[in-house]
Amino acid sequence: MIIGHKLTKEDKDKINDFIKKYYHLYPDYLQEEIDNKAMLGFTNNNDTINQIYCFLNIDDKDINPYFYYYNYLKNIYNLDDMNILEVGSGTIPILASYFDKNITLMDKYLIEHFYKDYNYLKESFDEDTNISDYDLVIGYNPCQATESIIRNAIKNNKDFSIALCGCCFLPKEYTERTAKKWHEYLYRIATELGKDNYDIRMDYFDKRYHIENPIICGKKNK
């Protein structure tokens, strides 16, 4: 869904200039996304396009979900005193741009040109990824890595927070494969694994963002 303002000529010129400079850095499947959707407007569900808009400062600040999520995290965790790992940071590190330099970014498909000012790991995250250097693991729509973040963080006694996407990665034995069932499954996994020493919560974006998917957080009990 398009939720941003109608693009001005200046906005379109910025996008065209971006495409001329950086289009070749994107993999084929994301080039197709840019071809089809770059000029449609800011959305409630397309990170590739939204990250470009934020990078170019043509996003509507009051519906920028990355900034909302950052402020949400600030209200729950003492971010200044934490080493943070962001999983699935995407092609352009928009969420990370709101943090101080205490954040490391991980994404197998990140575009290194946009990450030169950050510590980053161009690799996938799984349940066995070494997170010993971090206090908090976060992800904004990390898709397939979502369950691994929860399991890995709880196993290693780390705080975690994930803004969930609308995909579904339920184990194959589940027949009702919807985003809602996936979110319920993740919450159940988190509460079962963290029952002894975690406060697990599920929250939602404000209505103006038109994002139905929840945010799941796990904070260690002190």
Locations of regions flagged by a protein language model:
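Alpha-helix C-terminal capping segments
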Residues: 73, 77, 96-99, 115, ...
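Amphipathic coiled-coil/heptad-repeat helices and related helical stalk/stem segments
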Residues: 66-69, 89, 145-146
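S-adenosyl-L-methionine
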Residues: 2-79, 94
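SAM cofactor-binding core of SAM-dependent methyltransferases
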Residues: 86-125
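Short, composition-biased local secondary-structure segments
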Residues: 60-71, 114-128
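Domain-level detector for long C-terminal conserved domains
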Residues: 109, 117-222
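Nucleotide donor/acceptor-binding cores
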Residues: 82
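Hydrophobic, Leu/Ile/Phe/Ala-enriched alpha-helical segments that form helix-helix packing faces
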Residues: 19-23, 73-77, 96-99, 153, ...
